[in-house]
Amino acid sequence: MERGSCSAPGDPGHLGLFLQRLRQVFDACDGDADGFIKVEHFVALGLQFAQGDEVKKLAKRLDPNAQGRIGFKDFCHGVLAMKGCDKFVKGILGVTGTAPQHYEAPYTPYYYQSPETIEGPFLDTESSYSDSEFFAYEDGLTLSHRDAQHESDLDSAMYSTPSSEASDEGRNEDKAGGLGSLYLPGEQNLLKPSAGSGFSTHSTASLISNEEQFEDYGEGEDIDYSPGSPCPDDESRTNALSDLGSSVPSSAGQTPRKARLMYNTDLLDIYCTQCSKKITLLNDLEARLKNLKANSPNRKISSTAFGRQLLHNSNLSSSNGSTEDLFRDSIDSCENDITEKVSFLEKKVTELENDNLTNGDVKNKLKHENIHLVHRVHELEEFLRDQETKSEQVLDEESKRHRETYSKLAREKGTEIVLLSARVQELQEENEDLLTSLTRLKSHTVRIDEERQRVWDKLEDTSLRLKDETDLYKRLMDKLRQNRLHFQKEREATQELIEDLRRELDHLQIYKLECERSGRGPPSGLTELNVKSREVELEQEIRRLKQDNQKLRDQNDDLNGQILSLSLYEAKSLFSTQTKAQSLAAEIDSASKDELMEALKEQEEINYRLRQYMDKIILAILDHNPSILEIKN
């Protein structure tokens, strides 16, 4: 089973270890212990160890549905999908959602990979590289720690027997399946050149130090962290995991000649962006190796490696061998690796040259298109200048026409404003005159209203008095009518009585004459006495009736006098009202036409009432006492 392949976690033991460590990382990120990691909390933790864009990309891969939180199943799904184990995730975890981009290329050593294999992890997963470093830090495993474990295994492989060599290789495969499975295939490949590029063929001491240069950094000073160097915390963890033993002096490793020749070529200036990224990554690896060598002066070999060396030496001495043969074999294997790496780099340079030629053709095509576009731009610029010239001419003509129109309108508006100003001044003068007349008319109206109110009050008083006098006149007329009827009845009764007395007197006279003629009547003395007594009674009755008649006449005269006096008083009041009305003639000049017409109607009504009243008085006098109207000398 190859290291770094997706089938590595398929072993139940490896799968359990892998999921257990993923669970430890998930629990470390789950601060609330509710079974979910908030994306904000995850990004905040990631910003402490990586750049913001990389952390955001990683969070987007772990939370593809943008739910705002990451469950353990999604967490495992994202990590395994980044490792290229999407099919394995669907089979084991039962995840059915759409997974991020994955890598299914089988694992091959760095020096034996094809260009297509390298382009995947080196170019397409740059953000995943930093994201995987974040997960490795959470799990306590960093790049430096992995390099230390890898170099420790190399020491065991070179200084042990063939049987121990096989066992160590199996143990390394277990580590790759369990611990190294947190990385993408490309990221695991990035670690191998660091170990292999440090070998040299100069001396045996340099070979030993190059083999052990990634195992432990000793007690030297901490180096500054940079994107191309391991984190100091990872170095401290490596120091804690390794046992302190005897130190072995280190020597600087050598970068392959073919790579350095490629870096110094003049063709780097015309490489495309994809090639520049590849070369930058190689330069970064070389800088990291140099930085590790420069900042680790006191590297120590681990106690395990030192024990293996002693055991290997004892086995070799017992078998009449020497360590130099082992060193020679190791050097041969390293030379083979370097040769393979150089051949791979030559192949890569050839591909880059082909890409450069292709890019040259594309560049020529783009130049021709650019020339065509430049000519087109020049034509459009000429057209634009012509349009600008025409537009300026049209603008000048329109501006001139608008200025003339504006001046004409300004003159017309000026003349209109002068006329309107004169009209406004005239209206203001008329308004002032009207205000003066209005004030005078208001005062005159107030005075007329007061006079009218006084006349109206007097008219109401006169009307009340006239009504009272009319009532009194009606009562007196009723009483006079009753007296006339009573007097008429008494007069008729008196006339009847007188007629009766006359008839009786005539009858008595006739009876007396007959008695005297016949001589047969009663005695004359008695008859005369009866006649005399009867005459006396009649005379008394006549006097009484005369007195009553005289009294009635006196009462009638009194009533006529009262009626006349009342009529005269009413006439005087009407004449006084007419006089007062005539006193208003002085105000005719200041009164309006409507007021004059109303006053004239009132005067005519008063005159009509006076005529009717005079006619009534004359008729009453003619009926009751015509002697009043007689003209006496």
Curated annotation (Swiss-Prot):
GO molecular function: calcium ion binding; protein homodimerization activity; small GTPase binding
Residue numbers binding Ca(2+) 2: 63, 65, 69, 74
Binding locations of Ca(2+) 1: 30, 32, 34
Pfam families from the UniProt entry: EF-hand_7 (PF13499), Rab11-FIP3 (PF25450), RBD-FIP (PF09457)
GO biological process, one term: regulation of cytokinesis
Residue span(s) of domain FIP-RBD: 570-632
Keywords of this entry: Calcium, Cell cycle, Cell division, Coiled coil, Cytoplasmic vesicle, Endosome, Membrane, Metal-binding, Repeat, Transport
InterPro entries: EF-hand-dom_pair, EF_hand_dom, FIP-RBD_C_sf, Rab-bd_FIP-RBD, Rab11-interacting_regulator
Coiled-coil features, chain-numbered ranges: 410-613
Domain of life (superkingdom): Eukaryota
Entry GO CC: cleavage furrow; endocytic vesicle; endosome; midbody; recycling endosome membrane
Disulfide bond residue pairs: none
Biased amino acid composition, Polar residues: 238-254
Subcellular location: Recycling endosome membrane; Cleavage furrow; Midbody; Cytoplasmic vesicle
Residue numbers spanned by region Disordered: 152-182, 218-257
Domain EF-hand: from-to ranges: 17-52, 50-85
Signal peptide: none
Membrane topology: Peripheral membrane protein
Function: Acts as a regulator of endocytic traffic by participating in membrane delivery. Required for the abscission step in cytokinesis, possibly by acting as an 'address tag' delivering recycling endosome membranes to the cleavage furrow during late cytokinesis.
Entry's free-text remark on domains: The RBD-FIP domain mediates the interaction with Rab11 (rab11a or rab11b).
Subunit structure: Homodimer. Forms a complex with Rab11 (rab11a or rab11b) and arf6.
Name of protein: Rab11 family-interacting protein 4
Organism listed in the record: Xenopus tropicalis
Taxonomic lineage from the root: Eukaryota, Metazoa, Chordata, Craniata, Vertebrata
